[in-house]
Amino acid sequence: MQSDPNSYDYWPYVDRPKIVWPGGKKLAFWLAPNIEVYEYDPPSNPGRPGWPRPSPDVVGYSQRDWGNRIGHWRLMELLDRFALRGSVSLSTAVIDHYPEIVEACVERQWEFFSHGIYNTRYLYGMDAAQERAVIEDSIRSVQNATGQRIRGYLAPALTHTENTLELIAEYDFWYTCDLFQDDQPQPLKARRGKLISMPYSLEVNDVITYGALGMTPARYADVLKRQFDQLLREGETSGTVMCIPLHAYLVAQPHRLRMFSDALAHICAHAQDVWFATAAEIAAFYREVWWDAALADIEARGLATGGTSFAPAKSF
C-alpha cells in the first residue's frame, strides 16, 4: 500500500518565491485543444471499457468524429480571430486519419504534445516496455509529420501509470499534464532531467463542465471568467497559470461557441497582464528561470520528502 505517489513535495501556496512571467506578466494563459481519435470497436482493456455503452458504440464514435470533421475547424477559426495558438494534446493516429488537421496546426505554429496513439487505447495494464513504445511512437510520429520534438505529455484518457513520470523524464520531456495538484508549475521528483507538472485543469475542462456536469454555455463562460479573474488577482503576488482544455466535439457545437467566444474576449481584454503562450514556452521559461529557486525554497523550508538525483535525459 502507498499513501501518496511521491511524485512531488507538499509545497504550500503561500510564501513561495515570486514568479514573474516574461514582460512582467502576472498570468500565463494557454489553450489545450485535445485532438483525438476514438476507435469504433477498440481493443479491450482490463481496467476500463472503451465506451460507456456496449461496443461498438456508433453514437459515441460519430459524435467524436464530428469534432474532427466539423468542430475542429470551427474552433480553429475562432482562435484565429483572437490570434491565439493552441498546444495540441494529440492522439498520433490523427496524423494518419486527419492529416489536414495536423497541417493546419503546423501552419499556425501550434504546439503538439503527446496524448498517446488512440484515446481508446489505455495505459492501464501496460508494463514499462509497452508504455515506452507508446512514448517513442509519439516522439517519432510527431517529429516526422511536423518537425517538432514534443516536450509535453498527457496520458491517453488520463490513464497515467506508476511508470509514466520516470519514462517521460528519461526521454527529456519538460512537462506533464497528468497531475492536478497546483496552479503554478512545480518540479517533480523524477530521477532524470527537469520535469515539471504543468497546470492543466479538470474544473474548466469541457469534458467535465459539459459532459459530466451538464452546464449551460452561459454558465461555462461564467466559470471561465471567474477562474481567470481569481488567478489573475493571485498573479499580483506570484505568477499563475490558467489552462483551458478543449474538445471540439463539445465546445464547438453551434449553440455553445458564442459563449466560449465571450469568455475568450474577457481574457484577451486583459492582455497587458497576460502572457499568451504555449505549454512548452511556459515550461521552458520556468525550467530556465524558476526551477532552481523552487527546489531551494522547498529544501530551505524542510519540505523535501525524498532525495531527487537528476541525471541527463535520454536523447531520441
PLM feature spans:
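Positively charged, amphipathic and often flexible ligand-engagement surfaces
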Residues: P185, S197-R219, G239
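Catalytic alpha-helical scaffold of carbohydrate-active enzymes acting on polysaccharides/glycoconjugates
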Residues: Q2-S197, A221-I244, L250-F316
